[in-house]
């Protein structure tokens, strides 16, 4: 299994709409670890670690997000893989 790390900045209406909660739920379904946190600028930062195939599924999901959000864009960068035990909302 090819594990990778990925940092995503999600823009749009993504705060105060349950975005981090639904991201945690979706990540756990895909066995992806990491965190989601609100940024002061109104975006959400999502850091993910896991199998490349599962990260790809999460990236596809993040492009749309939950029904309560309106994603206008994502910026993706690969980061070094780190072993973590869960996905949390900060």
Curated annotation (Swiss-Prot):
Its EC number is 3.6.1.7. The active site is at 20, 38. One of its GO terms (molecular function) is acylphosphatase activity. InterPro entries: Acylphosphatase, Acylphosphatase-like_dom, Acylphosphatase-like_dom_sf. Keywords: Hydrolase. Residues 5-90 form the Acylphosphatase-like domain. It catalyses: an acyl phosphate + H2O = a carboxylate + phosphate + H(+). It is an enzyme of class 3 (hydrolase). Gene3D superfamilies: 3.30.70.100. Belongs to the acylphosphatase family. This is Acylphosphatase. It comes from Psychromonas ingrahamii (strain DSM 17664 / CCUG 51855 / 37). The lineage of its organism: Bacteria, Pseudomonadati, Pseudomonadota, Gammaproteobacteria, Alteromonadales.
